[in-house]
Curated annotation (Swiss-Prot):
It holds the Pfam family Ribosomal_L28. The lineage of its organism: Bacteria, Bacillati, Cyanobacteriota, Cyanophyceae, Synechococcales. Keywords: Ribonucleoprotein, Ribosomal protein. InterPro entries: Ribosomal_bL28 (IPR026569), Ribosomal_bL28/bL31-like_sf (IPR034704), Ribosomal_bL28_bact-type (IPR001383), Ribosomal_bL28_sf (IPR037147). GO terms for molecular function: structural constituent of ribosome. This is Large ribosomal subunit protein bL28. One of its GO terms (cellular component) is ribosome. HAMAP family: Ribosomal_bL28. One of its GO terms (biological process) is translation. It comes from the Bacteria. SUPFAM superfamilies: L28p-like. It comes from Prochlorococcus marinus (strain AS9601). Belongs to the bacterial ribosomal protein bL28 family.
Length: 78
């Protein structure tokens, strides 16, 4: 399984590490992914999902069902 959020699709970002002498080297900025077991109210069941912390904060604010629908994700597959 890839290192991507299953709800938002967020994945690693290519960036540059810049030293004091301004030598630039490539680096990969990974997403802060967490494995969480969330209660899905509409489906009346627990959902195991790999999710970014940014998406987790949004879910706490608006709810899992509403957030999944806004991102076009079907929670039945989890």
């Amino acid at each position: 399984m890839s290192r991507a959020c299953e709800l938002t699709g967020a994945k690693a970002n290519n960036g540059m590490a810049v030293s004091h002498s301004h030598i630039r080297t490539k680096k990969l900025q990974q997403v802060n992914l967490q494995k969480r077991r969330l209660w899905w109210e509409e489906g009346k069941k627990w959902v195991n999902i790999k999710i970014s912390t940014k998406a987790l904060k949004s879910i706490q604010k608006v709810g899992l069902d509403k957030f999944a629908k806004s991102n076009g994700v079907d929670l039945k597959k989890f």
